[in-house]
Amino acid sequence: MWLYYLLKTMSTVISWLPYKAVVVIGKGMGHLYHKIAKKQRVRAEETIRERLGYSQEQAEATIKSLFVKLGITFMEIMYMPALNKDNIRSLVTFDRPEVLWDALKEKHGVVMLACHMDNWEWLGAALALNGFPLSAVEKPQPNRVYSDFMNELRKGVGQEIFSRGTSEILGCARAMKKGRMLGLIADQDGGYDGIFVPFLGKMASTPNGPAYFSRKFKAPIVPIFIVRKPDGYGHKAIVRDPIHYEFTGDQKLDDYNVTLKMTQEVEKIIKEYPDNWLWFQHRWNTPYTPQEEEKQPDEK
């Protein structure tokens, strides 16, 4: 339990700081992280060169900016107990919140599509504190104590949390039936159960959860991404147009098409804000084989 109390104490102390101090300290931590995390840094630089065609100089500059942002993000996560309905509006601004409200009015629930951009934890916090009925699925970390601490922070700002490996499917279904927003991170490797679609020029196994819940409940998928403001202080939440599941009678094709559309939205935001995405994650971990190619439906 020592780790829990350490994290709790750190979070309490950091929450007392002015937000500007949180950002300044975070920048320093990010610079340090960039120097010591050689494995992640090299992997990120290699990936961005391969996927976006960057030169070594461009890759190094972009990934350094990413690491600095990650340092700020760590501090901001510890700062989450200080967030409330009053200050969140100045820290995270939404460009088109009406799109989210209109999607909720369809009364089928909403699949909120997010990715590992910037501080995705604050995206969930901002949605919940702005009154959106948000439920989300979290992937348990190897350290159970850390996962419990993070879930405590998430619930503290009003999110309903389901953990993978429990009865999360049932919980998600109930949330959708209640007309809530279901937050799903869909830029991770989907394993052998995922749907292979092109992603940044390479076939990638993509989680099938958004397609499943959109199909099951006839719910719109609303891509929403958070990016850090240029000066490092605060964030902007970018809301894209809803994606609706199209029923043709061929479920496999329909799942593929909606997954392709949402993946293309993730691609667009990454290319627009490349130093906000987590380039060192193992996104293409599941190999794409000729057998998988035969399984993919023809694109229309």
Where are these regions (language model features)?
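Membrane-anchoring hydrophobic helices of lipid-metabolizing enzymes
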Residues: 1-114, 156-158
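Soluble or luminal CAZymes and related metallo-dependent hydrolases
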Residues: 5, 40, 92, 164, ...
